[in-house]
From Swiss-Prot:
Its EC number is 2.4.2.17. The keyword Thylakoid does not apply. One of its GO terms (biological process) is L-histidine biosynthetic process. Catalyzes the condensation of ATP and 5-phosphoribose 1-diphosphate to form N'-(5'-phosphoribosyl)-ATP (PR-ATP). Has a crucial role in the pathway because the rate of histidine biosynthesis seems to be controlled primarily by regulation of HisG enzymatic activity. Coiled coil: none annotated. It comes from Bradyrhizobium sp. (strain BTAi1 / ATCC BAA-1182). Pfam families: HisG (PF01634). This is ATP phosphoribosyltransferase. Belongs to the ATP phosphoribosyltransferase family. Long subfamily. The gene is hisG. Keywords: Amino-acid biosynthesis, ATP-binding, Cytoplasm, Glycosyltransferase, Histidine biosynthesis, Magnesium, Metal-binding, Nucleotide-binding, Transferase.
Length: 325
């Protein structure tokens, strides 16, 4: 008998709250079996699923080992801690929270340094004058090396940072930094600026799958159910349901509505009584309502959608293709 599908989610703070809210919106209620301090949990209604509450960095390492099947973690941690990440894990879907950029930041006083090419010149000159390489404080060692190599920068050395990286230039432990930032305000408060082409990675929380986990039939079916929930909720969030009834609707009018407003008719054209159901992007609701009334509709109703379940699930299809490759 195969073991459970193990899903790792952040164990504390805003990331945990956002992850639980994300699953909750998809109809997947997470709960800790032993109370708030427990690090194991369940999803209501799914007996073959175990939730593991871990730090975001631990989630990335456990995905690399294949100790968990799915995990919620930042792309920055995946790219930094997992060599050849695209071969070992699959970023199934972005989750819309935890957004931040990994950036190269230099002192604002370096007024002539705006690009990575400028930085290359500065690092070369610095080594010639001081007989040692310029120091870069960061916890993103692998991302820094790859990005600097792509820009041909070699005259630097990394100073590994455990925390408060943005303060390193001010206290004299480094000349510049590579760090993660959401708004840039902390960098600015420490007298730093992001280079114009210095964004290494635009990161956010992702749902990630491990290739090396045990993907036997039980865990695979549980993953299909979870991804079905997630896709159904994501599809529903893109539309509102519009319903009306009138005799003047035909294929040409539906084609025009699709082209002008991006609507789809999930159940085909109108019924014999003239009933018509459309899915419409929220921003186009009023325009579509005006269009339908101009063509003869007396009443147009609009409702929110909780879930839209399609025959095919592109999220699970991506996972299946990844595991087969």
């Amino acid at each position: 008998m195969s073991g459970p599908l193990v899903v790792a989610v952040p164990s504390k703070g805003r990331l945990q709250e956002n992850a639980e809210a994300f699953f909750g919106r998809a109809g997947l209620t997470l709960s800790k079996t032993g109370g708030a301090r427990d690090y194991r949990g369940t999803i209501s209604g799914l007996d073959n699923v175990e939730i593991a509450y871990l730090s975001a960095s631990e989630i990335a390492s456990q995905l690399a080992r294949g100790s968990v099947h799915l995990g919620v973690t930042g792309e920055d941690l995946v790219r930094e801690s997992i060599p050849d990440a695209d071969k070992r894990v699959l970023l199934i879907d972005t989750l819309g929270f935890g957004g931040a950029n990994v950036v190269v930041a230099v002192p604002q006083a370096w007024i002539d340094v705006r690009t990575m090419a400028d930085l290359d010149d500065v690092t070369t000159g610095f080594r010639a004058r001081h007989n040692h390489r310029m120091r870069v404080a960061t916890k993103y060692i692998n991302l820094t090396r790859s990005f600097f190599a792509a820009h041909g920068i070699v005259d630097y050395r990394i100073v590994e940072s455990a925390g408060a990286t943005e303060g390193a230039p001010a206290v004299g432990t480094a000349e510049l930094i590579v760090d993660i930032t959401s708004t840039g305000s902390t960098l600015a408060a420490n007298g730093l600026k992001v280079l114009d082409d210095g964004v290494i990675l635009r990161s956010q929380a992702n749902l990630v799958a491990s290739r090396d986990a045990d993907w036997s039939d039980g865990p695979r079916e549980s993953a299909r159910i979870i991804l079905d929930h997630i896709h159904a909720r994501a599809r529903a969030s893109k539309y509102r349901e519009v319903r009306t009834r009138f005799k003047g609707c035909d294929a040409a009018m539906l084609t025009e509505a699709h082209n002008r407003f991006g609507v789809v008719a999930p159940f085909g054209g109108p019924t014999s009584s003239g009933m018509l159901t459309l899915h419409c992007p929220p921003a186009q609701i009023y325009a579509l309502g005006s269009f339908l009334r101009a063509h003869g509709a007396e009443t147009v109703s609009v409702a929110s959608l909780d879930y839209v379940l399609d025959r095919e699930n592109p999220l699970f299809a991506r996972l299946e293709a990844f595991l087969r490759s």
